[in-house]
Amino acid sequence: MRFSYAEAMTDFRYYIPLAQAAEAAGYHGMTIPDSIAYPFESDSKYPYTPDGNREFLDGKAFIETFVLTAALGAVTTKLRFNFFVLKLPIRPPALVAKQVGSLAALIGNRVGFGVGTSPWPEDYELLGVPFAKRGKRIDECIEIIKGLTTGDYFEFHGEFYDIPKTKMTPAPTEPIPVLIGGHADAALRRAARNDGWMHGGGDPQELDRLIARLRQLREEEGRTGPFEIHVISVDGFTVDGVKRLEDKGVTDVIVGFRIPYIMGQDTEPLESKIRNLEMFAENVIAKV
């Protein structure tokens, strides 16, 4: 089992020492959140809070995903950075291909390209992208980014994007794993066609259902190769629980040590955060 450390919506000056501490403690990865901006008004509900409340996001600092990952990659040597998750269809795919390809080449292929659609129509409006057909749009984005990060000439002609024969360098020396976030059936099918899935949390029974559905969809898609399953689960906090997750096919456990979905700023000191991640490494990672 591999373990990824998750921290978000905290003092952005903490990220560098936290990444260094996580690497030293034996974590395999660290998750990198994504948010462009906070809309003053929205009719949408936040998908990962019980009541759909989104106000806790107001004023929370999010360093741009590629900028943060490059900074953390420069001060680590082994830690992998998994986007959790990048709002892909609001961005131009050719530019994202250049960003993620350059990043992976620069930091030694230590990038997990976690992507999803945004639940906020305001994100699309802000960046001048239609909210409609976002599922089809993200599929085209993924195909384009995969093609442009090979280092070979690639062209694409789709419903939303038209890419003439083009080569981008530098390219990573390994394919960048494409990990899909989301619990909807369309997201699960998209994950089944790609390299892995990123779980957004929830009760254990729901996780079992989602994993079973992923297995079914992979069979339908004829996919038999390696597949990453990244989950948030209470089972991830004990040695016995980790074994149960392994038996279900989970490859990566995402662990954090506070609930970020609360109003106000995070006041936990950096020293406390580091001690928490170190204690988990001593009590769980070292014993599995």
Descriptions of predicted regions:
Residues 1-288:
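Active-site-adjacent structural elements that line small-molecule/cofactor binding pockets in enzymes
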